[in-house]
């Protein structure tokens, strides 16, 4: 009896994990990052394509991961062509470069936290291949991560931008009172992300 109860518990747990919801946020009128997000909006507005192949995504992530990490500007991402030419950038720069290279009009540029305990903001890309959402973080990873497989306390989105909108994610409900007061840069000088 106990082995079948254990088997049933494992089956239920795996089904719950398989049904994990990806936080795509709700439409936001404004964010604390609005004064700094112009390069992101310009790049996203220029995207015309649709979902590239997974092989192309993996190749781009590997290329972006090979760019040297250097924190330059705390809030504003470098234009993708600057990051490509220098082969250097922080998480914002690499994420925006990746958005541009993907040329997928449905991609999302995300600002959030790597984990609940982090104080420094991080940037990455959310991408849908037509079947599911993926976390693309070429600052820290060589390969895409299925968004529904990310641990509950990791890759916590706060705000995201797409060609068609700006989104606030559930963790920001506690941040709304201080929305105009944030001084947290996206990436931090001296904190090297391998």
For each feature predicted by the language model, list its residue ranges.
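Bacterial N-terminal signal peptides that target proteins for export
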Residues: 1-8
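N-terminal signal peptide c-region/cleavage motif recognized by signal peptidases
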Residues: 13-15
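A structural boundary/capping signal
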Residues: 18-194
């Amino acid at each position: 009896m106990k082995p079948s109860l254990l088997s049933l518990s494992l089956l239920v747990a795996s089904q719950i994990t398989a049904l994990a919801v990806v936080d795509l946020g709700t439409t936001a009128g404004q964010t604390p990052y609005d004064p700094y997000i112009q390069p992101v909006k310009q790049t996203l507005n220029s995207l015309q394509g649709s979902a590239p192949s997974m092989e192309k995504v993996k190749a781009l992530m590997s290329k972006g991961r090979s760019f040297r990490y250097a924190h330059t500007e705390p809030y504003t991402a470098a234009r993708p062509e600057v990051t490509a030419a220098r082969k250097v950038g922080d998480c914002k720069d690499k994420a925006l470069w990746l958005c541009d290279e993907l040329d997928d009009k449905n991609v999302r540029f995300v600002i959030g936290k790597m984990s609940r305990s982090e104080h420094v903001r991080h940037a990455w890309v959310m991408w849908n291949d037509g079947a599911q959402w993926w976390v693309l973080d070429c600052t820290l990873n060589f390969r895409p991560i299925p968004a529904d497989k990310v641990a509950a306390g990791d890759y916590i989105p706060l705000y995201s931008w797409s060609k068609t909108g700006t989104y606030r994610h559930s963790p920001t409900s506690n941040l709304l009172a201080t929305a105009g007061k944030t001084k947290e840069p996206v990436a931090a000088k001296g904190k090297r992300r391998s």
